[in-house]
Amino acid sequence: DFIYYQYYKNILRKSFCFFKRDDDADLRKTRRETLSAYQELIDNIVNLINRKGANQIRRANIFTTNYDLFFENASDKLLRNSTNFIFNDGARGLKTRYLQISNFHTSTWHQGTNDLYKFEIPTINLIKMHGSVSWRKVNEEKIEVSYPNSYPKDLEVDLDIPDIQTAIKLIEDFTLTHTAKESLALTNEDELALKEFRKEYDKLAIVNPTKAKFEETVFQQHYYQSLRLLSYELEKPQTVLICFGFSFKDEHIREIISRSLSNPSLIVYVFCYKHESKSEINELINNKKIIFIYPENNDDGHFIDLDRFIDCIFSVSGIDSMEGLTCSL
């Protein structure tokens, strides 16, 4: 329970992407820049979808293993600024919305007042394969999707206990003579509070980075439905898969991508954050059809971040967006 508490407090809590006035100035700046990059990415995808022919489905799929809400927040901001597209998070309902994988197969059309014309509105599907901080498990069959304006009250527990680094050192120093509870000097009240925290934490519909990450039936169902959807999309003709920030260490997703490479018209781009990442990914999935884009070295300015990724895919005339990068098989 202690580890889950520290994981939420130090990592997962940031995934809500709230912009608070009392946050550190550098953190607020980084979040604004990140949100802006997400907006630019989505806006460019919408523009690209709009160029599709009349007989093509105007839809793009974003598969992600991230829990955070940057895609949702960026899309909301674009929609409020009148960018015309449908953002589909897979949920269906009005006041209460539930996740339904079949919702990713829908399209929306705009029709003229006198039915003289109609056109398909671009759709972006966001398929969150490992769940989201905006999801809650209702029961063994349902996941509720909602977007809170504040952190979950029942998870906002402030305990006077060691941070994770201090805890590791304490356990290492006293593991031969003390239990973990004794090493961390946890009181009975601390243990009780951690148990209550864990009960609320387990209501989050996310895949935890543990060996037992798919033990919940409801999440097994969602995950494998997502895999089938990914496989189906990659088997379509003239498909482009762009991988950014993905290590290929999820063996199920890696296997789907590996099998899909038999599709003769599939194009796969893999963006590597560091120079060494290409060889690390190559050890996991090695195919001559994969195009790697990676830094020539790890000097400042050559790292791949979201802004650089956008510049490379949607290059601007007059700007050499590939400077310092290598594009190879």
Give short role names for the model-derived ranges.
Residues D1-Y7, N61, T65-E72, F174-E189, ...:
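Short N-terminal helix-initiation segments at or just after the protein's N-terminus
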